[in-house]
A protein has these predicted regions:
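Generic structural motif recognizing short loop/turn segments at the entrances and edges of beta-strands
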Residues: 5-7, 41, 68-69
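A detector for short, charged/polar N-terminal pre-domain segments
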Residues: 2-14
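C-terminal structural segments of small proteins and small subunits
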Residues: 52-77
Length: 77
């Protein structure tokens, strides 16, 4: 996968929770769908399967769902 395939998702704060990012990036319709995908092991954070919907994501973290990868871009401190 090349960097062109990774969509950057800007966030307002220095951190966002996984479930929130999935909705913000339009990878899921709602929190129920996010929870289901995470529970079924279909969400990867930085290349590893993540099972916590509340996982904190920071600048540079990547999330992959259904072959689509997004990258968290936080504002500079």
């Amino acid at each position: 996968m090349s960097n062109q395939d990774i969509e950057e998702i800007p966030i307002r704060d220095s951190m966002i929770r996984l479930g929130q990012l999935l909705k913000l990036a339009s990878l899921v319709e709602d929190g129920v769908e996010a929870a289901e995908l995470i529970r079924n092991g279909l969400v990867k954070v930085n290349g590893g399967i993540e099972d916590r919907r509340g996982r904190q994501l920071h600048n540079g973290d990547t999330v992959t769902v259904n072959g689509q990868t997004v990258k968290v871009v936080a504002p500079e401190a």
